[in-house]
Every structure is written in C-alpha cells, then in structure tokens.
A protein has these predicted regions:
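Beta-propeller domains with acidic blade repeats across secreted/periplasmic ectodomains
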Residues: 1-292
Length: 292
C-alpha cells in the first residue's frame, strides 16, 4: 500500500490480507495475486483516529482470546461476524498499544501510568454509557508514587525536566517520561520468573522497565517494580527510543527502537524541550529505526 499518511496500526490476517489503520481510515487490504501489493482496499471505518495527531488516537488492533480486535485510545473495538467486520462501542481507554495475559485480561497504559487491567470486558459497561463508575475496567495496578525507574544516564531531555524534583541529583529521571506498549511476556525463552510478567517501554528515558504482578488470592492484582533498583534493558544512548515490543514465534520478543533524538510529539513539546532539542541537534538523523 502506497500513499498512506501516518499509518499507525497493522494487523496481519489470513488469505494475504491485513488491517491497516491510517487516519482517519481503517482499511481491510488484500493481495490477491501474490505480488506483495494490496490489490483491494476496503474502508471498514472512517473514524479511526484523526489526521495529524501522533501521540493520541486509535491504535492497537490487538486480537484477543475472545476474538475481539482491541483498540486503544478510542471509543470502539472491532469484532467479526459471518457478514464481516463491525465496530462495538467501548469507553475511551489507554493511550498506546495493548497486551493480554494467559487468562485473557487486557492491559493498557497511559503517559506515566505504566499498567492498567480490564478485569471485566468493556462490552458490559458499554451497555450503559451513563454509568459514572466503571470499577473493574481499566483498573490502575500501580500508582505513580510507588513506581521508580532507573535510567543509566542523565535524562535532561524530558518534556518537563525543568520542574523541581523531576530529576535526581545525578540528573536521571525517577519516574516515567512517557510509558507505552505494555507487554505481558508469555514466551518460554527467558527465565521462568519473568514469564507472565509485564514489561513497558519508556522511550524518553531510554529504557524498558520490568514489573511484577502479584495476586492477593482473591483475584485482585497489584503491580510492583521487579527490581528494587535497576532495569531489564537500559541504554546510555540518548537516541535509543524503544516504542514497541512484540512477542516472537520462538518464545522471545522483539523490540522496536525508533532510534531518533526526538520522542515527544511537537504540539505537546514544552519550550524547555524545544530549546533542548535545538541545542543538541536532536531533530537531525531520522530514518534509523531498528529491531532487536
């Protein structure tokens, strides 16, 4: 598919087809003759995010165990019937990407809150949008005040690093700068104690943070930092910007590194960050992203 503007979501389907989210459209595109080009392109929905908005808007397309294709930061998710795809209304939840555990619970996050869980399917609350409280849906598993990150380099290039107490004495951030892409590790090629545990990326601080889930025995989950003081992956390179993690077929997982100096969407950049970017030439050298 060519001439897409800011495509932000992609889901491979059978029969050489795929779902492609390119605001404002969600396409169902198929390669009918095997030349790796989309010969057919059907618009399933024309309300998939807004053009020109990078940081906010529909994304995800995570295929859950209940056959729902979950969408984050949007007011519907996608379902399939004998007649094709259709949307189902939900409450607006999450910011960037989605994961699921072995029990089918859906996880999201937002900004500096690393992990939320749906104990209850959002379909039930969507039956009555007049409900004020939606307990059990998008439940916050760890408070910001209880979570700490440990970058291995000073991180002055944060959007609000000018604030008092934003940085430690060594110049590193103590809390998330912009967490996204929660992933429950469900593979078998990492140590057993990590299996079933959540990881989140925090590209502004150049790291991937490992959390641990605990169950109180009554089905209530809580999250905590896996390491008292440390990270599973961290870099001294300011351009290391992990933005996504994907489970791999071989029991490991892939890391998508945007590898660029700027990680904050321009309309939301503070004057402090704009000056920092200009002083350090961080807007230069684009198109160097990589996969681990």
């Amino acid at each position: 598919m060519d001439n897409l503007i800011l495509p932000r979501s992609f889901k491979v389907l059978d029969n050489n087809c795929a779902l492609v989210g390119a605001p404002p459209n969600l396409f169902h595109a198929c390669d009918t003759d095997g030349d790796l080009q989309a010969d057919t392109r059907e618009i399933i929905e024309d309300t998939f995010s807004e053009e020109g908005v990078l940081e906010h808007g529909a994304n995800g397309l995570y295929w859950g165990m209940d056959n729902t294709i979950n969408v984050s930061e949007h007011n519907w998710h996608l379902k399939i019937s004998e007649d094709g795809f259709y949307t189902s209304p939900i409450h607006w939840r999450g910011q960037w990407l989605i994961s699921q555990d072995d029990s089918g619970r859906i996880y999201r996050n937002v900004n500096s809150n690393p992990l939320h869980v749906d104990y209850i399917s959002p379909d039930y609350y969507a039956r009555n949008f007049n409900l004020i409280r939606t307990t059990g849906n998008y439940y916050n598993l760890i408070d910001q005040s209880e979570a700490e990150i440990w970058p291995i380099r000073p991180t002055p290039g944060l959007n609000r690093a000018y604030r008092a107490q934003a940085l430690r004495e060594d110049g590193s951030a103590s809390y998330y700068g912009g967490t996204s892409s929660p992933m429950i590790f469900r593979g078998d090629r990492l140590p057993e104690e990590i299996q079933g545990q959540p990881l989140v990326v925090d590209s502004p601080t150049n790291l991937i943070h490992l959390l641990k889930l605990e169950d109180d025995g009554a089905g209530n989950l809580y999250a905590d930092d896996f390491y008292d003081r440390g990270e599973i992956i961290a870099s001294t390179d300011e351009r290391f910007r992990p933005v996504h993690m994907v489970p791999s077929w071989d029991g490991t997982f892939y890391i998508i590194d945007m590898y660029r100096g700027v990680s904050q969407d321009y309309p939301y950049q503070t004057n402090y960050l704009k000056n920092y970017i200009e002083e350090h030439g961080l807007a230069d050298h684009r198109g160097l992203g990589r996969v681990y």
